[in-house]
Amino acid sequence: MVDALVVAGPAGDAGRKALAPLRVLTVPAMFGAEVTSGLRGMVQRGELTEQRARVALRRVRSARTMRYPFEPFAARVWELRHSISVYDGWYVALAEWLDTTLLTADERVLSASGPRCRVEPPV
């Protein structure tokens, strides 16, 4: 999502293209905090200006999202702990439950052996 919000070039273009047809973005409840953390890191590393980060945060706040709590997915997230982070596991567990494809640019998730859903990079 951060790529789609602020990254120029092919990575950002792929993210924006993948998100464009979606009316509602289905995400874990932590989505806003996670994106904010990613933007903060980019600003601290000098990869993003404060102004562009503020614009991206406004986009996140205005995005139509369906947010899901952690608790219903906790057991599955725990099962995935050996191959991906808890945070990534939440996205995987949610995609599995929704019987949908998880789009991610995260190589660790793309190459993980635990997910039962399709995991693909945005194209």
Roles of regions detected by a PLM:
Residues 80, 92-123:
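Acidic, PIN/NYN-like endoribonuclease modules and their adjacent C-terminal/linker elements
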Residues 23-25, 65, 96-101:
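Short active-site oxyanion
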Residues 4-5, 38, 112-113:
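Residues that scaffold the ATP/ADP-binding catalytic core of kinase and kinase-like folds
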Residues 27, 86-89, 104:
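Short beta-strand scaffold positions
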